[in-house]
A protein has these predicted regions:
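Phenylalanine-focused residue identity feature
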Residues: 24, 39, 63, 81-84, ...
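Outer-membrane beta-barrel strand-turn architecture
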Residues: 16-20, 67-74, 105, 110-117, ...
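Transmembrane beta-barrel strands of outer-membrane/channel proteins
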Residues: 26-32, 77-83, 111, 122-126, ...
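Outer-membrane beta-barrel signature, preferentially recognizing the C-terminal barrel domain
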Residues: 51-57, 97-100, 128-181
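Face-selective signature of the C-terminal outer-membrane beta-barrel domain
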Residues: 1-89, 114, 118-119
Length: 182
């Protein structure tokens, strides 16, 4: 059994300070991951099973945001856009096992306001958890006569929106968090 990986990644970020209370930032990320797995399993002396799995991930993202201060209020807000492609195929038969593309916007913001000895904060972020190749596989693995494991090529990514409100007074912190998962 042999596995090889090729990984390429890069990012760029530009900040522009308009004045002492306002900063803008824009940027982009890109990554490419390629993986090749060769499996050879000898089932008995007369036969063997061979597979070569090829996986590719391509992610392109762009983001923009700003930091602003107005009196005692500090705010950060922005947006990120991601395009993500996942390709997983049997390199011997050229059968595509998984070919998925996801495109999504991820907004975020945070506000911070001190009032006397109390620091108040409110924030919202959006995140994604994509299924792995292993979870998306359409093959079955038999561990013994009582145990089998299989993937599900129709799994979808999980998007989570986190909203948090917090109060801090000296060393005492109180927070309320809400999560929406879809």
């Amino acid at each position: 059994n042999e596995t090889t990986h090729d990984i390429y990644a890069g990012n760029m970020k530009i900040n522009y300070q308009a004045n002492k209370n306002l900063t803008f930032n824009i940027g982009a990320d890109a990554s490419y991951v390629e993986e090749e797995k060769d499996y050879q399993s000898l089932e008995n002396e007369k036969s063997s099973a061979t597979s070569r799995l090829h996986a590719e991930e391509t992610k392109l993202a762009a983001f923009a945001g700003c930091n602003v201060s107005i009196a005692k209020l500090s705010a950060q807000l922005g947006m990120r856009f991601e395009s993500f492609r996942m390709l997983y195929r049997d390199a011997i038969s050229q059968n595509s096992l998984v070919d998925k593309t996801y495109r999504h916007f991820y907004p975020f913001f945070s506000l911070s306001l001190p009032v006397k000895n109390v620091e108040m904060g409110l924030s919202m972020t959006t995140k994604v958890k994509r299924p792995s190749y292993y979870e998306l596989r359409n093959s079955e693995e038999y561990f013994n006569r009582y145990s089998i494991e299989a993937g599900n090529p129709w799994l979808l990514p999980q998007y989570t929106t986190d909203i948090s409100y917090s109060l801090q007074w000296h060393q005492l912190r109180f927070s309320v968090d809400y999560q929406r998962i879809k």
